[in-house]
A protein has these predicted regions:
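Specific aromatic-rich, kink-prone transmembrane helix
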Residues: 10-13, 51-71, 86-88, 105-106, ...
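Membrane-interface alpha helices of multi-pass inner-membrane proteins
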Residues: 80-95, 139-146
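Short hydrophobic alpha-helices at membrane interfaces in multi-pass membrane enzymes
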Residues: 23-25, 66-89, 125-133
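Aromatic- and kink-enriched transmembrane "portal" helix at the membrane-lumen/periplasm boundary
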Residues: 1-4, 30-55, 89, 93
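Perimembrane helix-loop-helix junctions
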Residues: 101-136
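Membrane-interfacial segments
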Residues: 15-23, 67-71, 114-119, 153, ...
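Transmembrane-helix signature of polytopic, membrane-embedded enzymes
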Residues: 6-37, 53-54, 72-79
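Juxtamembrane membrane-water interface segments immediately following transmembrane helices
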Residues: 139-206
Length: 206
């Protein structure tokens, strides 16, 4: 909950150039802080489903903070770009369905580039364009560093077993073994495992 509150505070600061009144920003802060994602039952435990909404919100706040400052000095937006890049990398690492982040990031970048090149009054366009590479570099660099750590200790340049093709193939084969025994929230139920133990000595060792 503390991380979600911090993300809300970053959003509050990010909107300052476009929301001048304190009451307006306070309203956005309160509505965001008490959104169902912050107190839903499945997000009250300290694990990835708890921090994922916070990281996505922090990424959104970082991009908004950078984009709403496109008329100010380029370096004023740098902290927000850094926050966006780091939070995107962290969000990408803690969920398997991270591809859902791509449309959000691509749309945000497209809108920013459209304003940057179509608005003739914006100065330092090259500097602003270069700053857009900061979150992308932190995003990709964070993922690469994590994969590199896995390679160093486990010999696999992957994010996790869940993202490896071998794991997905194995779990897919196990889940398809006895389709009539499938249960909700149980990928390989006990009845399926017991049946597989009889025909697979290797699986039985697990």
């Amino acid at each position: 909950q503390a991380l979600f509150a911090v993300s809300c505070l970053v959003l509050l600061a990010a909107l300052k150039p476009v929301m001048r009144t304190n009451w307006g920003r306070l309203f956005v802060f309160a509505v965001t802080l008490y959104t169902p994602a912050s107190w839903a039952e499945n997000t009250l435990r300290v694990y990835r489903d708890n921090i994922y909404p916070s990281l996505v919100l922090l990424a959104l706040a970082g991009l908004l903070g950078a984009f709403t400052r496109f008329r100010e000095k380029p370096l004023r937006a740098l902290p927000y770009y850094v926050a966006a890049g780091l939070s995107l990398a962290a969000a990408w690492l803690c969920h398997e369905d991270n591809a859902l982040l791509l449309p959000f990031v691509l749309c945000a970048a497209a809108v920013y580039l459209a304003y940057l090149f179509l608005d003739k009054s914006i100065a330092h366009k090259k500097s602003r364009l270069a700053l857009l590479l900061v979150p992308l570099a932190l995003w990709g660099g964070g993922i690469a560093a994590w994969c590199g750590m896995n390679y160093k200790y486990y010999g696999r340049f992957i994010i996790s077993d869940f993202t490896s093709s071998e794991f997905n193939d194995a779990m897919g084969a196990l889940s398809r073994a006895y389709p009539d025994d499938q249960k909700r929230y149980e990928l390989v139920p006990l009845s399926t495992r017991l049946a597989l133990y009889e025909v697979s000595p290797t699986f039985a060792k697990l």
